[in-house]
């Protein structure tokens, strides 16, 4: 029974195999029948069907446009769009269905009707032969340019001046074609300044001229706080002409948009002072006798053959602490003030209070000292905390003090007392012509040199005067490394 069943099953499987082979053979022999369907092109649609606006109700040239597409036998792989020019080479590809565009206005016109056309592309590369189109009625807005008051020159500057300004366009910063600056000449003096639309419309440049002689000069432009040389599209340095040394100058800025609309001009004036010396005299004496005291110092410098450039920085008075940096300095410290002070080899700084501009000296003179400059500071000391910022700059370790619980009230040097040199045997011995009250003795910081000392005395609550011996320094020279600073008090 089992043998007969096995034989039967084998015969059936053989027959099934023959039938399958026959069917496959017949299929290959017969081929596929039916009608071939061609790929159908996609269709494209604008989200907005039409726009009806005239006159002042026209749209800004910066517009967000959206569209969509459909493909009956596949899917939309992307789109191509064109603005005004719809010739075959003018289309741009995108996979987006919306974007923000700056629609171009014909140069010289204030209004225009701009054509925007878009067409879908399907997965087989077929393009919508018709596409979708819409004309946008737009009106151009005038751009603007304005100086930033905190980034313009002080009333009087030497050879370096900085200018910061902002530009804007209601149609978007991408619609700005250029921003320009001119000096004293608004007909032929305009110079393009490079800008990036990503900097929120803020620009900052510095202009340096050779101010060793008076007259009209050409200046070089530097960009940003990094003070990097500005170059044009051909790699040449950007120069500006018309700046006059020894005269009041006017700087102008303006902005031009893609349609050629020009902003109103903004302007700022400043005086460019000639630099005649390698020595700069900084007058930071805030009291009424400022000019008389300055002339006293200048007379002694003149005896040494020194005729310095003079910079008055004595505006403002300390109140509840240190004074703000003088408004007679540039408003921008870095790079303007630092670069300016570095133009001299030596600085002679006179002040009547350690809470005046000298507290800013460590910051503003960094490039001056980095270039090998030296400084002489004469300033009366007073009782200040050892944590005061002045000790970060002056080569002073400490100033005169009285032990707690004592009866001493102040310092005095009597008339006729000698001020004797310590470091240089050829230095003259000085003598006070009158009694001096309020001079504080000094202790030199490590690495500096005590130049002069004197016999300080102490006044007391009981009315008598005693000798003061803790320290007796009058002036100190800092010679530790480069640069060095020199101070007399």
Task: For each feature predicted by the language model, list its residue ranges.
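Bacterial Sec-dependent N-terminal signal peptides
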Residues: 21-55, 126
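Surface-exposed, short loops/turns at beta-strand junctions within beta-sandwich domains
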Residues: 104-113, 240-248
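Helical hinge/lid and interdomain linker segments adjacent to catalytic or ligand-binding clefts
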Residues: 289-392
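Solvent-exposed loop/turn segments flanking beta-strands in beta-repeat/beta-sandwich domains
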Residues: 70-86, 168-194
């Amino acid at each position: 029974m089992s043998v007969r069943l096995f034989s039967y099953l084998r015969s059936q499987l053989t027959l099934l195999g023959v039938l399958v082979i026959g069917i496959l053979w017949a299929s290959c022999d017969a081929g596929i029948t039916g009608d071939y369907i061609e790929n159908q092109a996609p269709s494209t649609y604008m989200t907005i069907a039409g726009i009806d606006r005239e006159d002042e109700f026209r749209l800004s040239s910066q517009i967000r446009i959206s569209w969509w597409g459909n493909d009956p036998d596949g899917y939309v792989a992307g789109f191509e769009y064109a603005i005004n020019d719809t010739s075959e080479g003018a289309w741009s590809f995108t996979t987006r269905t919306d974007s923000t565009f700056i629609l171009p206005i014909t140069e010289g016109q204030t209004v225009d009707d701009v054509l925007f056309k878009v067409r879908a592309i399907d997965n087989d590369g077929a393009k919508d032969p018709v596409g979708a189109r819409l004309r946008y009625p737009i009106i151009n807005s005038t751009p603007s340019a304005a100086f930033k008051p905190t980034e313009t020159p002080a009333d009087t500057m030497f050879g370096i001046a900085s200018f910061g300004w902002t530009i804007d366009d209601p149609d978007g910063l991408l619609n700005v074609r250029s921003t320009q600056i001119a000096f004293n000449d608004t007909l032929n003096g305009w110079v393009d300044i490079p800008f990036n639309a990503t900097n929120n419309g803020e620009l900052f440049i510095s202009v340096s001229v050779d101010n060793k002689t008076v007259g009209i000069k050409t200046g070089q432009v530097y960009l940003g706080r990094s003070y990097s040389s500005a170059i044009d599209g051909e790699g040449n340095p950007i120069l500006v002409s018309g700046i006059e040394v020894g005269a009041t100058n006017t700087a102008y800025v303006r902005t031009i948009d893609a349609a050629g609309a020009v902003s109103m001009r903004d302007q700022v004036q400043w005086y460019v002072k000639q630099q005649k010396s390698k020595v700069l005299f900084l007058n930071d004496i805030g009291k009424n006798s400022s000019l008389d005291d300055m002339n006293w110092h200048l007379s002694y410098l003149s005896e040494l053959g020194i005729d310095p450039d003079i910079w008055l920085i004595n505006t403002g008075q300390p109140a509840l602490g240190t004074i703000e940096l003088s408004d007679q300095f540039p408003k921008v410290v870095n790079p303007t003030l630092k670069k300016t002070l570095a133009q001299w080899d030596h600085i002679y700084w006179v002040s009547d209070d350690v809470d005046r501009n000298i507290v800013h000296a460590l910051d503003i003179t960094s490039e001056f000292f980095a270039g090998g400059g030296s400084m002489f500071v004469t300033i009366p000391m007073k009782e200040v905390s050892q944590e005061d910022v002045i000790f970060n700059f002056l080569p002073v370790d400490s100033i005169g003090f009285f032990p707690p619980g004592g009866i001493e009230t102040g310092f005095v040097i009597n008339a006729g007392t000698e001020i004797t040199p310590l470091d240089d045997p050829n230095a003259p011995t000085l003598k006070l012509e009158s009694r001096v009250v309020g001079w504080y003795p000094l202790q030199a910081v490590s690495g500096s040199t005590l130049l002069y000392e004197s016999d300080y005395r102490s006044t007391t609550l009981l009315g008598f005067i005693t000798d003061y011996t803790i320290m007796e320094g009058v002036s100190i020279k800092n010679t530790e490394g480069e640069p060095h600073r020199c101070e007399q008090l």
